[in-house]
C-alpha cells in the first residue's frame, strides 16, 4: 500500500515501517532492531566519553525528534553538524533514516544528502555543513495528483458502487458478480506488475459488465466513464486488432505498469495550493485512475465507515487521523489508539482496519480477497441481529458458513456456528467510576510489557527446541540422507505460526529466504539459525533481568496508590468543599429546601436545625486543639496577644461549649504551653493501646450529665470555624478508629498463629516477610495514631515532604489513608479562621454576649426545664441579631446525651427584623411593656376621652336605637340564661404575656380557663346506651345497603365458610364456635377457634 507518485513520499506508506537499514536509494531497506540502536548508541557513548556535552546533545536531538519537535530533515542537519568530525558515525546513522533518505560522504569531503522530496541530490561541504543545512530547501513532488481531484474520483466510485447495490437489491447475485469481475481485474493488475500483461483487458471487463447490466443503460453508460478507452475501442471495433499484436501488448503493459502503483487508503495530505485547481469532470475518470488509490475492498471499507459514523464531521475527523499517519506524524500503534473511539464499537471494521495496517507482518497469511465468504461477512449489520445479553449476536440465516474439512459429526453437533462474540469494553463506558486510575493503568502497562516479553521468549525457546530436535535427527543421519531431507511448513514442529514468528522477529524482511533455506537445505541452515536464536535468547534473558528491576520499582511505587481509588480526586474536591463559600452554600441550600416545604404546605413551619453533627469521642477534641495550637504558635504573622486569645478560645471557651473540662497543662504562661506541646506525645501514645492510667495519677473526672445543652448565637466567621473544627475532629476520629481496628485484627491474627504453632518448636514467621514481598514497618501497630499525629506536626512545620507523608500513610492505613492527605490544609484554614475571630470586633462581641447571657442563665441548662428559660433565650436571640445586623445569624446548640455531644446549626431568618426602623422597634417594645404591665393598663384608660369624636351624629342616633333594642332583648334572655348557668362552675385565670423579640402572645404555665356543669356525668351515663343504639342502627343500615350493592351470595358464602373454618385446604384442622353476648346493651356475636393440634410457630 505505498503511495502513488513518481517521487514517492518520505518515510512510509499506510503499512510501511518508519526506519530502514542503510542502502541505496531505490533498494528495499531491512528493519532496524533494538539491539542495532543500542549498539550505535554505545559507539557514540564510547567515542564521546571525554566529551559528555556532545553525547548529551545527541540524546537531546533524539528526544526532540521523538516528541515531534523537529522533522527528519532537521534531524539530519543537526546530527551531521554534531558529528562533522566523525564521518563513520554519520554513515552509520543512515541505518535509522526513513526510506529514501541517505547521507553519503565521498572522498572530496562533501556531504551528499538524498531526499525523496528533492529532485536531485544536495551536495554540501563536509567542513561547513551547518551553514549549508540552513539553506537547504525541499521541493514538493510535482508528480502527485491534487487532493481535491482524489476526493472527487473516490466519491464518484463509491457512489457508483452504492447505486449498483441499491439497484440490484433483489438480485444480490448480480452485485456479487460485478464485485468478482472488478476483484479479478484489480488482483491481476497487482500481481502482473513488472511483467508482460497477461490478465483481463479493460475491453474484456467492459464487455462482461455490459452483459451483466443488460437492460440497464444508465449504469452501463456511467461505468463507461471509468473506462473511456475501452468503451471507445469496443464501439469502433478496434479492440481485437490491438490485442492480437504481441509487441503492442508488451508496450501497453509496460505503459500500464508505469501508470499504476500499489494502492493506499489515503494519499499523503500535501500543502494547499496557491490556486484552486479546477476539478475534472466524471467523463475523464478511468478505472486505472480510480484503481491507483486502492482496491474496491478498501473503497467499500471507507463507505461502510462513513455509513456507520453517520455524521460527516466525525467521518472527516477519522480521515484526518489517517492523514496524520501518512504524514509520519503518528506511528501505527498511535493510529490505532486514535481511531479506536471511531471503530471501537464495530469489531469487524476495526479488524479490517488493523489488517490494512499490518500488511507486511501478515504477508504469509492468505489474501483477504481469497477468503471464503469474506465479502458477505463484511456486509453483516450486527446492530440489527438477534441478541443474547449484551455480548452475543446471532449470524443471519443468509450467511454462508465457511467450509471446514476437519470437522466430524460430533463437531457439527456441539460447536457453535451461530452466535458471535460482540463484547462491550469497559474502556468504552462513560461511567466515571469504571475508569482505571493512572496508577492502575501503570500496573496494567507493566503486566502487558511482561506478558509481551514472555511471549517473545517462549516463542523463541519453542523454536530452539524444535530446531534442536531437527539437529539431533540430522546428526544421526548419513550425509547423503541429510542432503535429501526436506522440512515442511512447520519446520519439524507442530505449529507453523510459532516458528515463522520467531524467525521473522530476528531476520525481518529476510525471513522468507531463511525459512525457504531451512526447508530445502536444513543440514546447512539449521545450525546457523539455531546459533542465532540461542544468542538472542541469552541477550533477551539478560535484558529481562534489567527490566524486572524496573518493573519491580514501578510496582512498589504504584501498588499502594492503585488500591486507593478515592485519593485521586480527593485533594481537589476537598479543597473546594472546605472553602467558606461552599460551607455557606451548603446550609443556605438546606434552608431554601425547608422554606419550599413550608410554602407548599408539606410541613408545618417550626424551628428545626438545618445541620446536625455528632462528636462521639471527647479525647479527639483535645487532639484537635493540640494540633491547632501547635500550628498557631509557629506562625510569625499572628501576634503574641492574638495567640494568647486563640489559646483561651481553644482551651477554655470551646470546652465550655462541649461540656468538657479545661485541657490539663494549659495556662496563659508560654513556658507551660511549650512544656505541654513537648510532653503531649506521651499521653497520646498510650491511647490506642487501651491502657488506663493509675488511679492516683489524676483526679477522678466529674460525673457527666445527660440531657443538658448550650445555646450559642454565631455569625459567619464563627460558623466557618465550627464547621472546619467538626471536619477536623471527624477525620481524626476515623484515623483513630482505623488504627484500633487494625490493631485488633493484628492481635486476633497473632492469637490464631499462636494456636496453630503450639506444637511447633520454631516460631512461624510471616510468609510475606520471608519472601521479601513485604517490608517490615518502622512503626508498631500500637503507635499508629500517635505516629500519625507526629507526622501531621512534622508536615505543618515543613520537616517532612508531602509525598513521603502520603506514602507513609498508605503503608499504615492502606485505602483509608486518603482522609489524612489534606490534614495540613485543614489545620491552616482553621488557624486562619481563628485569626479572624480574635481580630474582628463582631466576633469578640458574640463571645462577650454569650458569656453575659450564660451568667443570666439564658445560654443553656437542663433540657427538661428549657421552657422556663424561653423568654430569656428569646431576649438573647434578639440581642444577637442586633449585634450581627450586617451578617447571617446562626443558632448553634450543643446537646450532651449518652456521652456524646450533638451540635445542631440553624440559619435564622433576620431579613424582616433588619428592614424595620430601629426607632419604631423601640417604640413598639415600650408599648408592649406598658400594655403587659399594670401601670400601662391603668393610665391608658382615660387618654382616649380627651380627643375629639371620630363619628357622625346621625350614626350615633342609629346606634342608640339599636342599643335600646339590644337591652330589651337581653332583659328577656336574662331569665333563661340564669337558668342555664345554674349549677355551672367556671374560672378565668388564664395569663399571657407578649414576647418582646417576636411580638407574639405566649400563655403562662399553670394558668387556665375551665367551665363545668354539675350532674352532667350521671346524665351522660343514662343517655349513652340510647346514643350507642342509634349509631349502631345507622351503621347496620349502611352496611346492609353496601352488601347488596357490592357482594354476591356466593362470595358471602365463601367468606362465611372461611370464617367458620369449613375450608380445610392449607389450614390447620380447627373448629369455630359462635357465642352471643351483649356489649353496652347491644347483641354481638363472638367467634372462638379450637385447634385439634397446636399450629406450627412462625
UniProtKB/Swiss-Prot annotation:
Residues 238-247 have a biased composition (Polar residues). The keyword Amino-acid biosynthesis does not apply. Residues 673-694 have a biased composition (Basic and acidic residues). Residues 1-25 have a biased composition (Gly residues). One of its GO terms (molecular function) is transcription corepressor activity. Keywords: Nucleus, Phosphoprotein, Repeat, Repressor, Transcription, Transcription regulation, Ubl conjugation. GO terms for biological process: cardiac muscle tissue development; negative regulation of cell cycle; negative regulation of cell migration; negative regulation of DNA-templated transcription; negative regulation of transcription by RNA polymerase II; skeletal muscle tissue development. Residues 383-550 are annotated as: Interaction with SUDS3 and HDAC1. Residues 275-499 are annotated as: Interaction with NCOR1. Residues 30-100, 145-230, 283-360 form the PAH domain. Residues 1-26, 238-274, 661-702 are annotated as: Disordered. Residues 52-98 are annotated as: Interaction with REST. The keyword Transcription applies. It is found in: Nucleus. Ubiquitinated by RNF220 that leads to proteasomal degradation. Residues 1-299 are annotated as: Interaction with CRY1. It holds the Pfam family Sin3_corepress. GO terms for cellular component: autosome; cytoplasm; nucleus; Sin3-type complex; X chromosome; XY body; Y chromosome. The modification Phosphoserine is found at residues 667, 670. It comes from the Eukaryota. PROSITE patterns: PAH. Acts as a transcriptional repressor. Interacts with MXI1 to repress MYC responsive genes and antagonize MYC oncogenic activities. Interacts with MAD-MAX heterodimers by binding to MAD. The heterodimer then represses transcription by tethering SIN3B to DNA. Also forms a complex with FOXK1 which represses transcription. With FOXK1, regulates cell cycle progression probably by repressing cell cycle inhibitor genes expression. Component of the SIN3B complex, which includes SIN3B, HDAC2 or HDAC1, PHF12 and MORF4L1. Interacts with FOXK1/MNF, MXI, MAD, NCOR1 and SAP30. Interaction with SUDS3 enhances the interaction with HDAC1 to form a complex. Interacts with CRY1, HCFC1, MAD3, MAD4, MAEL, REST, RNF220 and SETDB1. Interacts with C6orf89. Interacts with MYT1L. This is Paired amphipathic helix protein Sin3b. The gene is Sin3b.
